[in-house]
Design a protein with these regions (language model features):
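Hydrophobic residues positioned within well-ordered beta-strands of beta-sheet architectures
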Residues: 4-6, 55-56, 68, 82, ...
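Beta-strand/loop substructures that line and gate deep hydrophobic ligand-binding cavities in soluble
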Residues: 83-131
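Hydrophobic pocket/interface hotspot
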Residues: 16-21, 27, 72, 82-84, ...
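Hydrophobic/aromatic beta-strand elements that line small-molecule binding cavities or substrate pockets
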Residues: 6-8, 67-74, 86-87, 95-102
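Hydrophobic ligand-binding cavity/cleft-lining segments
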Residues: 1-49
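A conserved amphipathic terminal alpha-helix motif
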Residues: 114-162
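Short strand-connecting beta-turns/loops that link adjacent beta-strands
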Residues: 13, 77-78, 103-107
Length: 162
């Protein structure tokens, strides 16, 4: 088992980041360009503990990579933490903890911790995960910058096409 950890300080208040963390549209936006999950495309409801789903993970939005399963273990409003258990393809276990915490007025720290078990492929999968999550954190900063110029109650309109 390998653990990948990455954190970023975002120029947004905790409530805003926590709201976005719970939306499947945020996940799709953060991963856009690397992969997509067609099963989530029309989903607008926030994540809820106990949910479980399986769908194709599409590399570069075109190539079916493998069927990925996610189970949402917890969505904790008090600690601003989401925990999932995921697996699929070569990945036996991908335990993901997403967390946000206030660090000052209009600023918060967002972190991802991923515990990965992919058997003999664990080191390679962990290396890939580190790259994916660095990309996702860059996209978080971009999303926050875009959101700073918009005030929209429409969740779909909150996510730009690129």
């Amino acid at each position: 088992v390998k653990t990948v950890y990455i954190e970023s300080e975002l120029a947004a208040d905790l409530d805003r980041v926590w709201h976005f963390m719970q939306l499947p549209a945020t996940f799709l936006y953060l991963c856009r360009g690397l992969f997509g999950v067609p099963a989530l495309r029309r989903r607008s409801e926030p994540l809820q503990a106990g949910e479980r789903g399986t769908g194709w993970l599409m590399a570069f939005h075109a190539l079916p990579a493998y069927r990925h399963t996610i189970e949402v273990l917890s969505v904790d409003d008090a600690t601003h933490t989401i925990r999932t258990h995921e697996y699929g393809g070569r990945i036996r276990s991908w335990n993901h903890t997403l967390r946000a915490e206030a660090v000052g007025p209009g600023r918060c720290r967002y972190s991802d911790t991923i515990e990965i078990d992919a058997g003999w492929f664990t080191d390679l999968v962990a290396l890939g995960a580190a790259g994916i999550f660095r990309y996702r954190h860059r996209r978080w900063h971009k999303l926050i910058r875009i959101q700073a110029t918009r005030q929209t109650p429409n969740t779909r309109a909150a996510f730009p096409p690129r």
